[in-house]
Amino acid sequence: MHTYGGLNAALAVAAVLALAGLLALYYALAAAAFIALTSAKGLMHHPLRSALLFAALWTLAELARGSWFTGFPWGAGGYAHVDGPLAFLARYVGVYGVGFVAAALAALLALGGHVRWRRARTLAGMALLLALGAALWGWRHLDLQAAPAAGQKPLVTEVALMQGNIPQDEKFVPGTGVLDSLTWYGEQLQANRAPLIVGPETALPLLPRQLPDGYWDALLARYAGPDQAALLGVPLGDMEAGYTNSVVGLKAGQAEPYRYDKHHLVPFGEFIPPFFRWFVRMMNIPLGDFARGSVGQPSFEWQGQRLAPNVCYEDLFGAELAARFADPGAAPTAFVNVSNIAW
């Protein structure tokens, strides 16, 4: 915000602290509700009920933080257990269910140290033993990584990843970053011979109709053969339908190039949240509102794979990724994440 937006340094720091405070507020409200309810309902002498209440309030706070104001789900407590003894529960109850169990166990352990709750120590010990036993059972009996069926070889696709390393503050500057992007990616897309080529988000920083004469047609012709395909970040759309942050797929046999439009947009980067236009004016960045793609867009099919693109931080929203598996027959075999600095 300060380096690229010109916002006063003190205000930029204040904005970051305000965001951190807002995210912490969910848990503060959950803790306040826990104290109020345990006091009002007389649960102070019922550690098991109190632990379940705490876990429920904690989970509600995480659900709210993961969905309200565009959502910040990637800090959910369940993710901390991806390599821990509770990991096997994820396939049954999801990340929020794992977080609920962890919060309940943590509450029982904390309550077990309360001098007035002697029985809680026994309950906490039992809960810990149950958790360890369940973990051992899970490690012994559950395979968390899907294996190919007997006699079925996993599909292997050779991929070339392109990265032009165009500085972010120059990427959309006419005559410098734009020219560098078009030149470098144009040369690489023409020269590379890998079966599948993947470029980053907005690798081509112009709409197809804004590209130099013959540039887009040359790319379409280059990938009209049967042996190669490309996935490339390109802005698409028009004033009437709206502009989208998109990934196009080029391969033979298409009437129109494959298209994936980013669904989960970045607040202040790709859309302006309601009531915050004053903040955008203060940031001094010429932002506009992008149009959203739909949830569960089709995959790009190539060499037996169904490749599901997503853009930038979309890979943090598990529920939206899971929506692409609604139809098992069209479910992705792999995700392809592209961002403005990587893939």
Model feature map: region roles:
Residues 63, 67, 95, 202, ...:
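Generic detector of well-ordered alpha-helical packing
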Residues 106, 165, 245, 337-340:
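Asparagine-centered polar/low-complexity signal
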Residues 131-136, 175-176, 336:
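Class I S-adenosylmethionine
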Residues 1-144:
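Membrane-embedded alpha-helical bundles of multi-pass enzymes
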Residues 139-271, 292, 297-315, 321-328:
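Soluble catalytic regions of membrane-associated enzymes that act on cell-envelope
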Residues 2-18, 41, 66-93, 243-318, ...:
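Active-site catalytic loop in hydrolytic enzyme cores
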Residues 317-320, 324, 331-334, 338-343:
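Membrane-proximal, cysteine-centered motifs at transmembrane boundaries in secretory-pathway
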